[in-house]
Amino acid sequence: MDAMTSPSPYIELDRTQWRTLRKSMPQVLTEDELEQLRGIGDEIDLEEVSEVYLPLSRLIFLRVEAHRRLNAATETFLGEAMPQIPYIIGVCGSVAVGKSTTARVLQVLLQRWETNPRVDLVTTDGFLLPTAELERRKLMHRKGFPESYDQAELLSFITKVKSGTQKVQAPVYSHEAYDRIPDQTITVDRPDILIVEGLNVLQTGPTLMVSDLFDFSVYVDARREDIEDWYIDRFLRLKNTAFKDPEAHFHHFANFSDEEATVVAREIWQTVNLPNLMENILPTRVRASLVLRKGPDHLVQKVRMRKI
């Protein structure tokens, strides 16, 4: 692994090198279970789980164990027991890159460690400002950009979880309604591990940010041309499935031809998602603990892991 001695904060491993680091981590997923976790257009299969995600699961296991030893050292120093501090993992990347699938697969793999940790998953979609508020602020065209989130609410949520607060509530988002679901929340009650998945979770700022509270982070990466293709493909699939629901926010696209829908999807990508990727998401890649680099087939080709 020559990359370990290169002048870079990252170790770069190709897939062949990375898969050997799985060691004895057992395969704990079935094809039926993976089907339930797979996102629209994502090509992840059991081989991908074995060669990419099981080594990652092993790495996180080792990091969590080190985290616990560090907490024990703090208790020894203070001479008193400390409340359990959840290990928080951020998962970041562009729209359509497959970060949601990555987060869901990781959640299941981590839950099935021999130590049986409680692993919760929260997406930052629930912390988007309600549609009515976005319209009031004239930000609907900026949905997904940092300013479209209730950053204070998100930071408060993560801070409470990190400090060991019981039964912390997180808002819930509906992709069908394209809005928060009023009066509906999920409860996060002192998990061993919390996975936070979202577009902008690695953002930095002049004051405390969500990313400052992460113990580990994963950035799902790919060429922007590939992500554009995946976004358009996903849009076409949704046109023929979820958009057909009369209650769906994008129902008006359901009767578009594939050619018409492709034009719409490409315009949305080029005017909203690509600028957000280039201005806000991609610049945070350097802050990730680990980068999963995908090829055109949606499968991971190489991994970059921070040395420090």
UniProtKB/Swiss-Prot annotation:
Single GO cellular component term: cytoplasm
Location in or out of the cell: Cytoplasm
The keyword Magnesium is annotated on this UniProt entry: no
Associated pathway: Cofactor biosynthesis; coenzyme A biosynthesis; CoA from (R)-pantothenate: step 1/5
UniProt cross-references to PANTHER family, sorted A to Z: URIDINE KINASE
HAMAP family per the UniProt record, alphabetical: Pantothen_kinase_1 (MF_00215)
Name of the protein in question: Pantothenate kinase
